[in-house]
Amino acid sequence: CEDVLIRDCTVNAGHTLLGIGSELSAGVRNVRMENCRVDCEVWRLLYVKTNPRRGGFVENVTMDGVTAKKVTQDVIAVSSRVYYGMPGQEVAGPNPQLTRIEGVTMRNVHCDWALRGVTLRCDPDYPARDFRLENVVIDEVFENFVRVENVDGVKLDVTARKIHPDAHW
């Protein structure tokens, strides 16, 4: 899947505004979402999720000019080890097929309320690369504001106007 443009949308129902994965085995590239508004409660605004048994790539994903009211999980989340409850599935085997994740940009995003801000948790054996978050504003954050693991080349311009006392950095 490549060269996807999503723009000028108003979302009134759904669980993730832009979700990529989890069972991809080929690739996703050049995805752009711009000037969208989320009027409902969603789990996440941008979620990239991959399974270490599938391989493939995710590259050049941009979200620009998005407003949201309530995000019940993460404003942006990336996980390169997503499993769906099959016993033994969490073991990728001797030759895991890790997914290359690079070139993810989120800019000019405003969210009124989020449980968590930024959660980027990637594989230590194949770190994600080149993440840019520019002018991302969250009015209230209740748990982790920023958590980044195994990502090379991260640039964060993320503001939380109010972080609740039990939130972690």
Which stretches of residues belong to each language-model region?
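Extracellular/periplasmic carbohydrate-active domains that bind, remodel
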Residues: 1-169
